[in-house]
């Protein structure tokens, strides 16, 4: 039986994959990329074992060093950084591990470039917002406002690099103070809502599985993670076939998500594709289709078709309880009564899990300590 290595950061994205595999009685090995070992993930009873490294390159070194011990292991990437690192080391790792990505080393990292993705999106017929590639303030004369800035490579940027700019002065500030050497600046679209198509590609896009779509009800700032409703594809007019064509053109195999924004006129705009497990993907598992497990089966001798044929679908509400509380309840943007009502209708939380309660308790303690420190600062 093949082992499974789940690798990524200290995030509910990684935990979602661990939980999905646990539903099928598989305990994965966690290769955690984190500055220290103070992680809620390490409190989980759903792991076979774990190892903590500080950087993605350290993770690659670990995989190379332990390639015979883990020979044949199925790898699942849960961050842009790890997806790119695996891609950049494919020629070294491919003989020992079942990797997500493409057969060509470096191709996924090239595809992560937002301008490259936009061009590919145009080729398959997506609506793509007008954009500009910006390296310095000398490049911004042609930009139209309002606009939104994004790191050209998500793995290289921070949340603060994503900003809505209403004038030249705003844009200059982001470029001068931001952490990126290069930005994609897009025309800002007034949205009605945003949605994701979370899926799995097998055999370089020969088979593309997209069970439903996630509609974000209350997005947390600077991220597409938020209180969401996962629904049937019958409830939205989405460019599914174009998405499958897009994935085939990338020649990618593995877990993915494709993000869209629908404007106030009903037009859908392609935002980007994530070449990894998505942070919201627990909604797909909760709805009845276990994509991480199907990826595991497709890369083992067990076969995946029976599992796929037995998959069901029901709509679910999913909440990232800690970011949602901090972003909306703690700041007073929504009332505690409203939040409790949303909790009551939530089917799945991104950390709270009765089968594995210690990670949740750890996060509660960490949140209370942070609030206490803020209280001390205010009173002093």
Outline where the language-model segments fall:
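Peripheral (often C-terminal) accessory segments that flank ATP-dependent C-N-forming ligase machineries
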Residues: 297-380
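Active-site nucleotide/adenylate-binding loops and adjacent lid/helix of ATP-dependent enzymes
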Residues: 108-184, 189-190, 203-206, 237-238
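Protein kinase-like catalytic core scaffold
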Residues: 147, 208, 269-272
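ATP-binding N-terminal substructure of ATP-dependent carboxylate-amine bond-forming enzymes
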Residues: 1-103, 369-379
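ATP-dependent carboxylate/phosphate-activation module, predominantly the ATP-grasp catalytic core
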Residues: 169, 187-251, 274-299
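A short glycine-rich, hydrophobically flanked beta-strand micro-motif that places a catalytic Asp/Glu
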Residues: 253-265
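Short glycine-enriched loops at secondary-structure junctions
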Residues: 32-37, 80-82, 203-208, 213-216, ...
């Amino acid at each position: 039986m093949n082992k499974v290595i789940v690798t990524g950061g200290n995030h509910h994205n990684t935990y979602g994959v661990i939980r999905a595999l646990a539903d099928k009685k598989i305990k994965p090995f966690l290769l955690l990329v984190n500055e220290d070992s103070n992680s809620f993930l390490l409190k989980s009873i759903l792991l076979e074992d774990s190892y903590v490294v500080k950087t993605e390159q350290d993770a690659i070194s670990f995989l190379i060093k332990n390639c015979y011990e883990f020979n044949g292991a199925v790898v699942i990437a849960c961050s842009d950084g790890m997806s790119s690192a695996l891609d950049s080391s494919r020629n070294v790792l491919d003989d020992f591990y079942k990797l997500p990505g493409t057969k060509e080393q470096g191709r996924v990292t090239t595809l992560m470039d937002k301008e490259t993705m936009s061009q590919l999106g145009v080729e398959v017929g997506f609506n793509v917002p007008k954009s500009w590639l910006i390296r310095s303030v000398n490049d911004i004369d042609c930009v139209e406002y309002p606009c939104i800035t994004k790191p050209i490579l998500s793995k290289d940027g921070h949340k603060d690099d994503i900003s809505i700019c209403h004038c030249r002065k705003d844009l200059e500030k982001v470029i001068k103070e931001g952490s990126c050497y290069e930005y994609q600046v897009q025309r800002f679209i007034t949205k009605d809502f945003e949605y994701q198509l979370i899926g799995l590609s097998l055999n370089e896009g020969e088979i593309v599985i997209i069970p439903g779509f996630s509609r974000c009800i209350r997005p947390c700032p600077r991220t597409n993670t938020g209180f969401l409703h996962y629904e049937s594809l019958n409830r939205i007019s989405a460019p599914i076939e174009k998405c499958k064509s897009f994935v085939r053109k990338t020649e990618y195999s593995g877990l993915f998500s494709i993000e869209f924004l629908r404007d106030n006129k009903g037009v859908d705009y392609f935002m980007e594709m994530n070449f990894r497990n998505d942070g919201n993907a627990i909604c797909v598992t909760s709805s009845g289709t276990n994509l991480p497990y199907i990826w595991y089966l497709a890369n083992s001798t067990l076969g995946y078709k029976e599992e796929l044929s037995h998959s069901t679908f029901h709509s679910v509400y999913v909440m990232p309880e800690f970011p949602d509380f901090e972003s909306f309840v703690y700041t007073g943007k929504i009332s505690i009564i409203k939040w409790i009502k949303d909790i009551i209708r939530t089917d799945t939380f991104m950390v709270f899990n009765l089968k594995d309660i210690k990670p949740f308790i750890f996060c509660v303690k960490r949140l209370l300590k942070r609030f206490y420190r803020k209280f001390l600062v205010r009173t002093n």
